């Protein structure tokens, strides 16, 4: 079973979304642990709640500091806690580009509108003034542009005829408390999701020259060459033949390399029951910590072992430049 993801939450005030995430983390099947709650306001009410729940806290005021300097202080605290993801929960600071880059694809935010509508402030009144029938909230990845990152999930909230900004905000907040923990859990556990893992392999395998996908004994495999005479260079395996792991099968140069890999890192590599005797190696991908650059390298290496010479010659020539 994969280790739980480690997250840090940034707040500036009472932290109601923080509280929802904290209480969700108490469930035994929650895929994340909260390592730190940090704030730019030492008096933020949410810090007291986090402390009461035995969660480490950190605070450092931003006044008198450049945006970059304060972000670096926060970054250092997050890294020091061991967190792998940053969750913004009412953190009222525009983050520097450098901070955003450091946490690219590992930082989430929740926004009280159905993005891309109504980025920024006053979202409730803007939705009412526009005559919208529904408003809502969105969880998205954080990018350099405000409220512009890829949307991971949304919840619609009906706008009632007598709604004002406050009444609408109170119902959207309830939706936020449901949406944020659920979306966070889904996102941090995606690397253990077989469908997500398969798509990562597929994208990388099909990016190689003259490749195509074909089922083999019910499992997706990738071949190089023509439909009739192509050769397999990789397979996806999902707990087949009594094996417990989700993995990628690739070719090695032979028994010596296979044995060396198994001896050097038995937690990563294993001998597949079906093709192990043929010199193939399996790489575990359901640990939640897959190194996808490493996987790309293996796919390329395995591809070169079976690709037609005309293709490998082209690769060799290209590598000279």
Name each region found by the language model.
Residues 1-45, 49:
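N-terminal Rossmann-like dinucleotide-binding module
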Residues 6-8, 33-36, 83-86, 244-248:
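Short active-site oxyanion
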Residues 24, 32, 85, 89-192:
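Donor/substrate-binding cores of folate-linked one-carbon enzymes
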Residues 39-40, 63, 67, 81-97:
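N-terminal glycine-rich "phosphate-gripper" loop used for MgATP/nucleotide binding
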Residues 53-54, 103:
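Short, structured coil segments at secondary-structure junctions
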Residues 58-63, 110:
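Short beta->alpha connector loops at strand-helix junctions that form conserved
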Residues 72-80:
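Short, well-structured alpha-helical segments in soluble
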